[in-house]
Amino acid sequence: MTGLEIWLLAIGLAMDCLAVSIASGIILRRIQWRPMLIMAFFFGLFQAIMPLLGWLGASTFSHLIESVDHWIAFAILAFLGGRMIKESFKEEDCCQRFNPASLKVVITMAVATSIDALAVGVSFAFLGIKSCSSILYPAGIIGFVSFFMSLIGLIFGIRFGCGIARKLRAELWGGIILILIGTKILIEHLFFNN
């Protein structure tokens, strides 16, 4: 993957963090830097760790399925993208009440928003990323972008509330990005792989 593709993938994966952070910001209602930084830290941390775990698990058996790895990467990214697009059309109350600053809630949200990153880590193994040092760069970018987008989402939610959050459709755009990356991987392997 190119640097641009990694950054686009990171943005796509961070859309769940952005959406959850906007909802959390709506509930927080005022800037509280400590809980906001803690939330953004955990979102970024889990988004960075999950691709490593997915890659580690899949890299142990990737040699067994090399002939279909591009199909697997495409299927994973298309499924995740499709799910994100579907979720973007659900009518849910973005002002739903919970305490987003409690550590238990923060960790639960961080794990829930990083499941997609775990699947992406699996697809990294199928794309030929062979060494731990090669996976650290994309994982770091994914974590950084998720941290940054979470912080932006919190501030955005605090400032603008529910009306804007519904119009943003962050999950829709994240899903589209994941599907496009999966399609590109499939086309490259089918038509341009020697």
UniProtKB/Swiss-Prot annotation:
- GO annotation, cellular component aspect: plasma membrane
Compartments it resides in: Cell inner membrane
TM regions (residue ranges): 8-28, 36-56, 61-81, 109-129, 138-158, 172-192
Q: Which UniProt keywords apply?
A: Cell inner membrane, Cell membrane, Ion transport, Manganese, Membrane, Transmembrane, Transmembrane helix, Transport
Q: How does it sit in the membrane?
A: Multi-pass membrane protein
Annotated GO MF terms: manganese ion transmembrane transporter activity
Under InterPro entries, the record lists: Mntp/YtaF, Put_MntP
Q: Quick one: signal sequence residues?
A: none
Q: What is its main location?
A: membrane
One Pfam family linked to the record: Mntp
Biological role: Probably functions as a manganese efflux pump.
Q: What family does this chain come from, according to its entry? A: Belongs to the MntP (TC 9.B.29) family.
Question: By what name is this protein known?
Answer: Putative manganese efflux pump MntP
Task: Record the organism.
Answer: Bacteroides fragilis (strain ATCC 25285 / DSM 2151 / CCUG 4856 / JCM 11019 / LMG 10263 / NCTC 9343 / Onslow / VPI 2553 / EN-2)
Q: What is the lineage of its organism?
A: Bacteria, Pseudomonadati, Bacteroidota, Bacteroidia, Bacteroidales
* Gene name per UniProt: mntP
